[in-house]
């Protein structure tokens, strides 16, 4: 078994916590000695023990770690946060070598973990290949803004709604389950006031007791004109209203209103960055999506295409502002979801090696 195989095991461990770690990265670990896997572990939840400590806790006898090799998908931390530093625990356990999937881009770590381990007699090796585990986390600490994904479903003739201002349900069950997974991977979800009025969406992830559900954001000119009987306001979890006017009514402790003279996509991104929100899913509508594309702030586009023809004056998927220049994206994958097809593209410079 090669280093890459053990690292792949660590990746599978990390993925068990998808949607549970909030602004923390997904991290998995595998402890190996004499070609035998002694223990595996991962970071289960935001605020809980880190992957390295979780792995060590699974040993029948702590002495087993002496002389072992630890495979971990992300550089171990060397600072005191919600948890004590992992590097200290790793060194104290007598681990001989740590094989690392990627250096942590967060400036509080960024090479300091490797330095600590080396200074305490632990061999280290960075082999790469785990960057795709934490695309948004890496992007946020490298680019200092959230990773933006634009998502929409459309008919085969490129329309998102039938003519007339009523909701058109386009995709089947498999695509809707896939959307749930996509929401789980994002820390915030944004829609415009029109989408709230026409679709009356929940924008929730159907997982009970999710510790940090995505923040749901509604972009509106006047928050007071929103329909507060909409089902989004009957659910738990944070809701942000981005309005040009102050909210004059009390609509619940989980609703927060931010005001600006005009909420441009750049201002939205700036607000999220200030709150250390690393990922945003823009779910509509047509106008809001056009604004984000026109300002060149979309890093990934997820399109669900269904074999329906809406025709006529039905609303196109992206409608509004013209582009100053053509945006180039690269195909990530195409997936069949029963009768629907999902196409994912990502901006070239955002592709993880």
Give residue ranges: language-model regions.
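Enzymes that bind and transform nitrogen-containing heteroaromatic metabolites
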Residues: 3-25, 60-66, 82, 147-149, ...
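Zn2+-dependent cytidine deaminase-like catalytic core
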Residues: 31, 36-132, 293
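Active-site beta-strand termini and strand-to-loop segments that position acidic
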Residues: 33, 142-143, 346-348
């Amino acid at each position: 078994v090669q280093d890459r195989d053990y690292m792949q095991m660590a990746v599978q461990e990390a993925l068990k916590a998808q949607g549970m770690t909030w602004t923390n990265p997904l991290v998995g670990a595998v402890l190996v000695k004499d070609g035998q896997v002694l223990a595996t572990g991962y970071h289960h939840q935001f605020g809980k023990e880190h992957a390295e400590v979780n792995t060590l806790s699974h040993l029948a006898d702590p002495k087993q770690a002496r002389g072992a090799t630890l495979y971990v998908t992300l550089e171990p931390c060397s600072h005191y946060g919600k948890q004590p530093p992992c590097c200290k625990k790793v060194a104290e356990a007598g681990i001989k070598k740590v094989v690392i999937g990627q250096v942590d881009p967060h400036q509080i770590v960024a090479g300091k973990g490797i330095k600590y381990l080396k200074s305490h007699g632990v061999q280290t090796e960075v082999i790469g290949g785990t960057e795709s585990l934490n695309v948004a986390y890496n992007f946020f600490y490298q680019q200092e803004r959230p990773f933006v994904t634009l998502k929409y479903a459309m008919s085969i003739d490129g329309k998102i709604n039938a003519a007339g201002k009523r909701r058109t349900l386009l995709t089947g069950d498999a695509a809707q389950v896939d959307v749930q997974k996509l929401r789980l991977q994002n820390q915030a979800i944004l829609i415009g006031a029109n989408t709230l009025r026409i679709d009356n969406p929940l924008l929730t992830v159907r997982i009970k007791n999710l510790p940090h559900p995505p923040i749901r954001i509604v972009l509106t000119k006047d928050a007071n004109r929103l329909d507060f009987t909409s089902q989004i306001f009957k659910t738990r979890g944070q809701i942000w209203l981005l309005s040009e006017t102050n909210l004059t009514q009390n609509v619940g402790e989980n609703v927060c209103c931010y005001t600006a003279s005009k909420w441009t996509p750049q201002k939205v991104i700036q607000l999220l960055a200030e709150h250390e929100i690393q990922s945003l899913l823009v779910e509509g509508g047509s106008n809001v999506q056009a604004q984000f594309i026109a300002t060149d702030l979309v890093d990934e586009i997820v399109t669900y295409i269904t074999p329906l023809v809406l025709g006529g004056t039905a609303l196109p998927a992206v409608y509004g502002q013209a582009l100053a220049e053509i945006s180039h994206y690269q195909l990530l994958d195409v997936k069949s979801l029963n009768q629907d097809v999902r196409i994912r593209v990502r901006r070239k410079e955002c592709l993880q090696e």
